[in-house]
Amino acid sequence: MATTLNPSEISELIKNRIEKVKLAAESRNEGTVTSVSDGIVRIFGLADVMQGEMIELPNNTFALALNLERDSVGAVVLGDYEHLREGDVAKTTGRILEVPVGPELLGRVVNALGEPIDGKGPLGTDLTAPVERVAPGVIWRKSVDQPVQTGYKSVDSMIPIGRGQRELIIGDRQTGKTAMAIDAVINQKGTGIKCVYVAIGQKASTIANIVRKLEENGALAHTIVVAATASESAAMQYISAYSGCTMGEYFMDRGEDALIVYDDLSKQAVAYRQISLLLKRPPGREAYPGDVFYLHSRLLERAARVSEEYVEKFTEGKVTGKTGSLTALPIIETQAGDVSAFVPTNVISITDGQIFLETDLFNAGIRPAVNAGISVSRVGGSAQTKIIKKLSGGIRISLAQYRELAAFAQFASDLDEATRKQLERGQRVTELMKQKQYAPMSIANQALSIYAVNEGYLDDVPVNKLLAFEEGLHAHFANTQGELVSKVNATGGWDNDIEGAFKKGIAEFKTTGSW
């Protein structure tokens, strides 16, 4: 039997259908993919696209708009692009690339887009921030006057780093650049400084080893690791440094101190060169694009020490009376010690000083292989702790005199007493600057070692026994002068009482002969 509907039921059904119809119009700017090659997509028909805007592609894939041309847009795909085809629809999103930020990222390993890759589950933060941001202006900055202790005697005494400084670590491959940066991160344990380690274009096995070392030394808890491995696209390697910087800025903006390591910017420049050439931008010196200086300057200028007013304004009055800082340690790899190449000279001119590591010193067993002659810190001197500043003046002079005399002494058969003493002192200072990896040194221990060599207490100690003597001296002071060591570590001060205790303690230890 056929079902009959009343006219009233029919009108009710029609009304219900009409109510369910969505009338809200969504304005979408769409275009068509005309070519896909090497991670670059060209899109025809997109209008009103922003520089750096996210473009939505099929299968939840996104691309970053970099080339805005008259009739097309050149964009670099973030992630896998093998499923993309000519004729696919591309849509604008109206937003620029953002990454997750917050303390929840500490202890985690994420990729360049802030997605966790360590198998520890979701990040648990809803906060995001744009990867590109204008650096704080001059008005909002404060002078660098607080130290960042790296735990290296040679760096903290001769090339001190301050909070908010940019200090370049430069040298050939296999000279200990990453080791120095990782030790600096490990040494921030207990200081309140949060760390971000950005690995650009490194092997996944190398990054896994670094994460393991950080965990073993109790440093992963205060560190975010951003990994863009060698197997990832050039786009991910290019963007990773900016993503890491955004994560570090979160702490700076809220009146905290952060340290970021870019390892290394040479590989980022190569990735950017690859993207630029694929986008058919005109090449310049060494085939780099014309804006490769801006690539690094806009990144490194974001490292700063910001004023109390900046923090108060940013947090809308929630945090008052606190300055924030982001200290940057960019790493550059040179080829055969050539610091006059394009990218090294660029980064040297942007940063506030450089630590130059030499292959010859490294191979001679002087590690860290710091060349004190051409390494410099332009602003860190005012940030040095009082005790190290007071004691370290003689170190640089001793090394400079030693280098000058050592070259001269090769040709001279008989040396006068004063010259011989200077050479011997220089030998001992050079030996004393050696340090093992993953063994950062406290302020008190550094001060003890420097004081002992400056005051001539090590002149009668054989050079091959120096490091054993130093180790024994530190242990002796830890056992007999624990309070003094804690006081020096806490305050970094220097007075007659501390000097008297140092003199007495070193003399006592020398009489024991237990090294």
Curated annotation (Swiss-Prot):
Q: Where does ATP bind?
A: 171-178
Is RNA-binding one of the keywords UniProt gives this record?
no
Keyword Cytoplasm in the entry? The reply is no
What is the membrane topology here? Peripheral membrane protein
Q: Name one GO cellular component term.
A: proton-transporting ATP synthase complex
Q: Provide this UniProt record's keywords sorted from A to Z.
A: ATP synthesis, ATP-binding, Cell membrane, CF(1), Hydrogen ion transport, Ion transport, Membrane, Nucleotide-binding, Translocase, Transport
Location comes to: Cell membrane
This enzyme catalyses:
ATP + H2O + 4 H(+)(in) = ADP + phosphate + 5 H(+)(out)
- Marked site (Required for activity) residue numbers: 375
As recorded in UniProt, its EC number(s) are 7.1.2.2
PANTHER family from the UniProt entry? ATP SYNTHASE SUBUNIT ALPHA, MITOCHONDRIAL
Subunit composition?
F-type ATPases have 2 components, CF(1) - the catalytic core - and CF(0) - the membrane proton channel. CF(1) has five subunits: alpha(3), beta(3), gamma(1), delta(1), epsilon(1). CF(0) has three main subunits: a(1), b(2) and c(9-12). The alpha and beta chains form an alternating ring which encloses part of the gamma chain. CF(1) is attached to CF(0) by a central stalk formed by the gamma and epsilon chains, while a peripheral stalk is formed by the delta and b chains.
What does the function comment of this entry state?
Answer: Produces ATP from ADP in the presence of a proton gradient across the membrane. The alpha chain is a regulatory subunit.
* Protein name as annotated: ATP synthase subunit alpha
Q: Which organism is it from?
A: Stenotrophomonas maltophilia (strain K279a)
Q: Which gene encodes it?
A: atpA
